Amino acid sequence: MKTFFLKEGQIDKKWFVINAEGLVVGRLAAFVATLLRGKHKPEYTPHMDCGDNIIIINAEKVHFTGKKFKEKVYYKHTGYPGGLKKTTPNNVLNGKFPERVIKMAVKRMLDDGPMARKRFGNLYVYSGPEHKHQGQQPKKIDFASLNRKNKK
């Protein structure tokens, strides 16, 4: 028996929507990263984009456990000498783009490389309750009911 390799035409991508209101960021990001990679499917192939499309709504209403909301620090560098910039999840969630907290968490849970960048493109995060993907008829995932620790 030969090893099965998925072909491009055999990929079945589904659409899922997750309401992030009251959910813990790290647990949500780990779950979403698994769905984006397609590791929950029996036909998972590492070199193919066989993951699903994920829509996350209410991204500004996520929670952190412990003191991470005020004490966790996100770093980025401008590329110039002395250009190290710091921010906290509190500043990001109260800022102009609160959905970046979830995007940063999921992106850092994916591997590096061109395939991860392609998979990350299948993630759509919205800060409010509305999204523009009703035409795809996404299935709702109740992530909070999967484990009591998922919701705070």
Curated annotation (Swiss-Prot):
SUPFAM superfamilies listed in its UniProt record: Ribosomal protein L13
The keyword Ribosomal protein is annotated on this UniProt entry: yes
Sorted UniProt keywords: Ribonucleoprotein, Ribosomal protein
Domain of life of the organism encoding this protein: Bacteria
GO biological process: negative regulation of translation; translation
UniProt similarity note: Belongs to the universal ribosomal protein uL13 family.
Record protein name field: Large ribosomal subunit protein uL13
Organism: Wolbachia sp. subsp. Brugia malayi (strain TRS)
